[in-house]
């Protein structure tokens, strides 16, 4: 049994995702993580591995997560491939019937959404190519010479070069959308196209099943009368009212076909030469009637352009009162998580930013000159025979705050989840403590400098040093801070491993 999942369900899913982000009952977050990629793969930066989609790796994504940023309604858009118009480039034209046996002439695409049939001009206006100059002498179309710049509702040529292109204006990308969502490979489509007022003129001008283009792939032989024009030639099919004008040249061949009345309601159609009074001659011409998408051109921009991708805009930056995003260490993973929960709670996280790290407020004579190497290990003896181990994310010499993470590599497994027979620190991950037991201590030894201690006298989210207030990004209780998000909650729905960058 042969079956497919159509592109339309992909478009539907993209739209549903956008709606989900807009739903107040949901919380979507982007996240950054993984400061130690070389522990996973030595050549990570030159060849990042493809993320693995299993529960073991999902747990590791959580354990190596650094911080999260809320994705709001204005941070998500459906997008389509960005094809910038360039003089001399030949583009595919819109067709309703691309397939493996009827590929796009220019790109070779076997389906519409893989073809290069729409463009972005220099003014950030988007046009669909309804005719690319294709004719029996140029079956692959011709180079485009005139950049479309008009905003007329009806399709037309863009200039006087005679390149044969017919363009239809669809929409203009707003400056605010350009800044947030126009990328190297993708460009946004407008929100609320089906119901909004901003692009209503284009949408409301669409005619369901209205014919705009008839192409000529064979000019025929011995047609009609030389140098004649035949008007009101009917276009037959399951719609009604469409007509075209056929020009026959001096060789009694079809020179051009122009739609004079688009009609409506067509899902298939043919030109009826006989009913139009055009003698068919010895060889009938081959005329292809191009059927518009459902609703007509401009009715549903998502369906017409294949908007099954979503682009998320997430600006990863600190503010003075909530510095959750670390600096001085690298990140090599980004992702998206749906409905994570607050730490120690089943309540869905709603904060604009959240830290996924543990943190210690340290004190000691040399805290302002001590250093902790990024990704290095540090320990606390919590009690006799019990050691807490963390790996350094960063250390702030001004505030004495040490941020860290703990993953399975600290408890009997390597980074890829393989069990180790003799782990250095045992098989348990122990939390750092402001109240160590018998045989334990508050001492934390830095990479360089004098020994420091957990500052059990400090609780709060900010500290004052030399009459200046410093916000720490997360709340401390007796010198120890938990993450702000409950690890392993919600659904990680997107992961991207990438070459590491250092945040500064």
Q: For each of these PLM feature ranges, what is it?
A:
Residues 1-126, 130-504:
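Feature for peripheral, non-core segments
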């Amino acid at each position: 049994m042969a079956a497919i999942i159509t592109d339309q369900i992909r478009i539907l899913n993209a739209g549903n995702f956008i709606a989900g982000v807009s739903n107040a009952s949901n919380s979507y977050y982007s996240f950054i993580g993984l400061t130690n990629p070389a522990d996973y793969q030595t050549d990570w930066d030159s060849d990042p591995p493809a993320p693995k989609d299993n529960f073991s790796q999902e747990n590791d994504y959580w354990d190596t997560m650094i911080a999260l940023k809320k994705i709001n309604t204005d941070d998500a858009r459906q997008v389509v491939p960005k094809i910038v118009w360039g003089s001399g480039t030949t583009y595919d034209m819109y067709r309703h019937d691309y397939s493996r046996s009827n590929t796009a002439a220019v790109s070779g695409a076997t389906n519409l959404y893989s073809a290069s049939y729409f463009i972005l001009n220099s003014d950030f206006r988007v046009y669909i190519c309804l005719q690319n100059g294709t004719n029996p002498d140029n079956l692959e179309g011709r180079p485009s010479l005139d950049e479309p710049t008009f905003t007329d509702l009806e399709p037309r040529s863009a200039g006087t070069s005679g390149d044969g292109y017919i363009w239809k204006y669809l929409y203009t990308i707003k400056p605010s959308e350009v800044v947030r969502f126009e990328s190297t490979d993708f460009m946004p489509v407008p929100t609320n196209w089906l119901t909004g007022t901003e692009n209503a003129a284009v949408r409301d001008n669409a005619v369901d099943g209205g014919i705009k283009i008839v192409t000529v792939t064979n000019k025929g032989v011995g047609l009609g009368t030389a140098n004649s024009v035949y008007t009101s030639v009917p276009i037959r099919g399951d719609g009604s009212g469409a007509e075209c004008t056929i020009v026959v040249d001096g060789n009694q061949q079809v020179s051009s076909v122009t739609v004079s009345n688009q009609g409506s309601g067509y899902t298939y159609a043919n030109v009826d030469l006989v009913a139009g009074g055009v003698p068919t001659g010895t060889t009938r011409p081959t005329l292809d009637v191009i059927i518009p998408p459902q609703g007509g051109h401009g009715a549903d921009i998502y369906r017409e352009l294949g908007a099954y991708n979503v682009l998320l805009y997430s600006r990863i930056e600190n503010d003075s009162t909530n510095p959750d995003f670390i600096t001085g260490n690298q990140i090599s993973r980004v992702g998206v998580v749906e409905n994570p929960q607050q730490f120690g709670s089943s309540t869905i996280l709603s904060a604009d930013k959240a830290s996924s790290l543990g943190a210690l407020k340290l004190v000691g004579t040399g805290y302002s000159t001590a250093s902790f190497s990024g990704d290095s290990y540090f320990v606390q003896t919590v009690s006799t025979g019990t050691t807490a181990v963390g790996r350094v994310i960063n250390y702030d010499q001004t505030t004495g705050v040490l941020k860290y993470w703990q993953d399975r590599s600290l408890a009997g497994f390597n980074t890829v989840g393989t069990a180790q027979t003799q782990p250095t620190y045992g098989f348990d991950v122990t939390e750092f403590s402001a109240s160590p037991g018998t045989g334990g201590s508050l001492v934390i030894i830095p990479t360089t400098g004098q020994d420091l201690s957990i500052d059990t006298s400090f609780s709060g989210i900010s500290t004052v040093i030399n009459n200046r207030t410093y916000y720490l990004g997360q709340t401390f209780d007796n010198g120890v801070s938990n993450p702000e998000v409950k690890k392993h909650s919600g659904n990680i729905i997107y992961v991207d491993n990438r070459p590491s960058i250092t945040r500064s």
